[in-house]
C-alpha cells in the first residue's frame, strides 16, 4: 500500500482535484520502454563503428508485401534504422551483431548478421493480437475482423476522481464532445459522438451496459471490464434509429476460475475553484458608477466622504463592503471514494461482487446552520454482483444484480439563479446580514447570502435497481460447430423522492440610525417564521427482452464466416405520472442481423441491418429498415 499524490485540473468542471490514492498498482516493465522506443517517428543511423560492413535488407509481411517504417535495431547498441516505403533498409554492422526487427502488430524477430550482406525478413502477425476480441453491437468479434469505427478506452484513463463516469470522458477519445453543465456535487456531463445528428432533445448516444440500455452514470468505473464507442453506420446499423447518435458499449467485470481475489481502493481528495469571474471591488465599482452618473447627469452619485465610509468599513450596516465571491465560496471541499470487490470461482460457478461509496462536498460557504443544515453534499452507494453458472458443459446461466443509492443535500432553490444574483449584486448593495441579526435585503434586487443560507433546503433520494438474467446454449456438438443461442431478460426500477423544506423569512432594508444609534428599518419583503414542507415522487420501470442466434466458424484455415440474427423488445413505463404526461407509449421492438466473411483474416466483408419499430410514430411510419455494408483490407 502506498500513498500517491495525484493532481488533476478539470477545466470542464472548473475544479482542481488533488487525489491521494492509498492503494494503487504500479507495473514497471523494461520491455515496455523498449517497445515505446521502437515506435518513435524516426530512428537515425548512428555511425559509431566505421569498421563494420554495410548490410542491405527488406522487411515483408506474411503475404510478401513490403512493410514501411519497420524498426531495425542493433542489439545492445544505440544504432538503428527504419525501412523506407519499399520496406528496404541499409545499415552498417559487424558480423557478430544481431538485428532486432520489429513492427506494430508483428512478432519481433532477432537475426544474426554473420556473413549475410542482404537480409530478407518475413514478419508474422502477433497471434494474441489477431485472436483478441472486441465488444461490438450485440456481441463480440475478433479485433482483426472489425471493419466499423470502434474505439476502446483504457480503464486507467477512465479512473478519474469524479462522481459520474460521464464527467471523466473529456479528452479521452477523438470525436467525443463533452459538456459539463453544472459543477454541483454529483453532477454528470452531457456528451455527443461526432457532433449532434438529431434535432430536438433526443440527441444523446445510446448507452448499453451488458447489452441493456441504461445510464452510464450508474456504473462504477471499478466494475468496468471494457468500454467501447461505436461511431459509424457499419458499427451502429443493428440498433436502427436508436443508434443514430452513436453507441457506447460497457461490459462489466465477471468472475474467473480462480481462488478468491480481493481488491480494495481508497481515495481522499480536495476540490477548489480554479477559475472564477473577476468582479469589480468596492472602489472600482464606485468609480465606474460615478463615471456613468457624471457623464449622464453631471454629478457624482457617491460623494468622496461616502466613498470613504464604504472603503473604511466604519459602518458596515449602512455602508457595506462585501466581496460576494469570498463570502459565498470556501477555499476547498473534500471528496472520498472507497471501493472493494471480490472475484473468483470454480469450473461450475464464477462470481464477481463489488461495492463502493463516494462522497463529495461543495465549495459553497454555508455559514448559518443553527436552524437547519443547507450545506451541499452528495453521497452514492453502489453494489454489483455478476454470477455465471455452467448448468451443463454447453449451457451457461448468468445472473447480474446491481443497485445504486444516491442522496443529495442542497440549499432550496436554483443554484444557477444564486450564481446570477452573486454576479449582478454590487458590493455596496447590502450587507450579508445586519449586525443585530436582522436579515438584509436591498430596496431593489436580492441578497445572495439569503438565497444560500435563509431559503430552506432540499433533500433528494434516488434509487436504481437493475437485474439481468441470461441463458446461453452452445449447439456446436448438437447441431453444427460455432452455433450458439442466447436469451436475455432484464427488469430495472428507478425511484426518486425529493423533500423541500422552504423558508420565506421577512427581510429588511436599513435607511439610517436613530438618535440612540439603532438602525432604522424598512421591510423589504414580508415572510413567515414557519417552515413549509413539500415533496415529490417519481419513478420508472423498464423491461428488456432479447433472443439471438450467433454463428462463427473457420473453414479450411482460410474462410471465416459469421452470422447473427436477433429479436429485441423494450417497454418503458412511468410509475408516477403527474398532471402532465408527454407520451403514453414507450415501446420499441425490432429485429437485427449481421453477416461477416473474411479470407485469410486479410480481406473482410460485413453486412448489417436493423428493422425497428416504435409506438411513438404514426401507424404507417412506425417501422424502418436500416442496412449497412462494408468491406475491408488489412
Per-region residue spans from a language model:
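Residues on the lipid-exposed face of transmembrane beta-strands in outer-membrane beta-barrel proteins
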Residues: 252, 264, 340-346, 385-389, ...
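Outer-membrane beta-barrel transmembrane domain signature of Gram-negative proteins
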Residues: 179, 320-343, 429-440, 503-618
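Transmembrane beta-barrel architecture of outer-membrane proteins
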Residues: 164, 188, 245, 335-339, ...
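Transmembrane beta-barrel strands of outer-membrane/channel proteins
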Residues: 264-270, 355-357, 399-403, 487-493, ...
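Short loop/turn motifs that connect adjacent beta-strands in outer-membrane beta-barrel proteins
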Residues: 255-260, 347-348, 363, 394, ...
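Flexible, surface-exposed loop regions and adjacent strand-edge segments
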Residues: 279-285, 369-374, 414-424, 500-511, ...
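Flexible loop and strand-edge segments within Gram-negative outer membrane beta-barrel domains
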Residues: 273-275, 316-356, 360-363, 374-448, ...
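Short, small/polar-rich motifs associated with maturation and membrane association
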Residues: 1-383, 397
Amino acid at each position: 500500500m502506498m500513498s500517491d499524490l495525484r493532481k488533476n485540473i478539470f477545466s470542464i468542471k472548473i475544479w482542481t482535484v488533488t487525489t491521494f490514492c492509498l492503494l494503487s498498482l504500479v507495473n514497471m516493465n523494461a520491455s515496455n520502454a523498449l517497445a515505446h522506443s521502437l515506435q518513435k517517428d524516426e530512428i537515425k543511423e548512428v555511425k559509431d563503428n566505421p569498421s563494420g560492413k554495410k548490410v542491405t535488407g527488406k522487411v515483408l509481411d506474411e503475404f510478401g508485401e513490403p512493410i514501411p517504417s519497420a524498426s531495425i535495431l542493433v542489439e545492445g547498441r544505440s544504432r538503428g534504422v527504419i525501412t523506407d516505403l519499399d520496406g528496404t533498409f541499409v545499415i552498417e554492422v559487424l558480423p557478430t551483431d544481431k538485428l532486432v526487427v520489429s513492427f506494430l502488430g508483428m512478432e519481433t524477430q532477432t537475426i544474426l548478421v554473420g556473413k549475410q550482406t542482404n537480409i530478407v525478413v518475413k514478419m508474422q502477425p502477433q497471434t494474441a493480437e489477431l485472436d483478441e476480441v472486441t465488444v461490438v453491437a450485440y456481441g463480440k468479434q475478433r479485433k482483426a475482423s472489425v471493419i466499423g469505427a470502434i474505439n476502446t478506452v483504457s480503464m486507467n484513463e477512465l479512473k478519474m476522481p469524479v462522481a459520474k463516469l460521464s464527467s471523466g470522458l473529456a479528452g479521452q477519445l477523438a470525436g467525443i464532445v463533452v459538456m459539463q453543465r453544472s459543477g454541483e456535487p454529483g453532477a454528470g456531463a452531457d456528451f455527443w459522438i461526432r457532433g449532434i445528428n438529431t434535432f430536438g432533445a433526443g440527441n444523446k448516444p445510446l448507452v448499453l451496459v451488458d447489452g441493456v440500455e441504461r445510464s452510464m452514470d450508474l456504473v462504477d468505473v471499478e466494475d468496468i471490464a471494457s468500454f467501447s464507442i461505436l461511431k459509424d453506420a457499419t458499427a451502429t446499423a443493428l440498433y436502427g434509429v436508436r443508434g443514430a447518435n452513436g453507441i457506447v458499449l460497457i461490459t462489466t467485470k465477471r468472475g474467473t476460475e480462480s481462488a478468491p481475489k480481493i481488491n480494495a481502493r481508497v481515495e481522499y481528495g480536495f476540490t477548489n475553484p480554479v477559475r472564477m469571474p473577476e468582479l469589480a471591488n468596492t472602489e472600482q465599482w464606485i468609480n465606474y458608477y460615478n463615471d456613468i452618473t457624471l457623464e449622464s447627469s453631471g454629478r457624482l452619485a457617491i460623494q468622496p466622504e461616502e466613498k470613504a465610509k464604504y472603503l473604511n468599513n466604519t459602518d458596515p450596516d449602512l455602508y457595506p463592503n462585501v466581496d460576494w465571491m469570498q463570502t459565498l465560496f470556501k477555499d476547498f471541499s473534500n471528496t472520498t471514494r472507497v471501493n472493494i470487490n471480490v472475484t473468483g470461482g470454480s469450473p461450475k460457478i464464477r462470481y464477481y461482487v463489488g461495492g463502493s461509496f463516494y462522497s463529495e462536498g461543495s465549495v459553497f460557504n454555508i455559514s448559518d446552520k443553527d436552524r437547519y443544515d443547507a450545506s451541499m453534499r452528495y453521497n452514492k452507494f453502489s453494489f454489483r454482483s455478476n454470477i455465471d453458472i455452467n448448468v451443463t458443459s454447453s449451457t451457461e446461466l448468468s445472473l447480474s444484480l446491481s443497485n445504486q443509492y444516491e442522496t443529495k443535500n442542497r440549499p432550496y432553490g436554483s443554484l444557477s439563479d444564486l450564481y446570477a444574483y452573486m454576479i449582478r449584486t454590487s458590493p455596496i448593495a447590502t450587507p450579508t446580514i445586519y449586525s443585530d441579526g436582522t436579515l438584509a435585503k436591498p430596496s431593489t434586487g436580492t441578497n445572495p447570502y439569503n438565497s444560500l443560507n435563509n431559503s430552506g433546503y432540499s433533500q433528494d433520494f434516488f434509487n436504481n435497481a437493475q437485474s439481468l438474467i441470461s441463458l446461453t446454449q452452445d449447439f456446436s456438438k448438437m447441431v453444427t460447430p460455432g452455433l450458439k443461442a442466447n436469451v436475455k431478460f432484464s427488469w430495472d426500477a428507478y425511484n426518486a423522492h425529493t423533500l423541500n423544506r422552504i423558508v420565506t423569512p421577512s427581510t429588511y432594508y436599513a435607511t439610517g440610525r436613530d438618535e440612540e444609534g439603532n438602525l432604522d428599518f424598512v421591510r423589504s419583503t414580508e415572510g413567515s417564521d414557519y417552515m413549509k414542507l413539500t415533496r415529490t415522487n417519481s419513478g420508472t420501470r423498464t423491461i428488456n427482452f432479447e433472443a439471438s442466434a450467433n454463428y462463427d466458424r473457420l473453414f479450411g484455415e482460410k474462410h471465416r464466416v459469421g452470422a447473427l440474427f436477433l429479436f429485441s423488445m423494450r417497454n418503458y413505463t412511468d410509475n408516477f405520472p403527474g398532471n402532465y404526461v408527454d407520451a403514453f407509449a414507450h415501446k420499441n421492438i425490432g429485429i437485427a442481423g449481421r453477416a461477416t466473411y473474411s479470407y485469410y483474416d486479410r480481406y473482410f466483408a460485413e453486412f448489417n441491418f436493423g428493422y425497428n419499430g416504435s409506438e411513438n410514430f404514426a401507424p404507417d411510419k412506425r417501422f424502418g429498415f436500416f442496412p449497412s455494408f462494408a468491406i475491408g483490407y488489412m
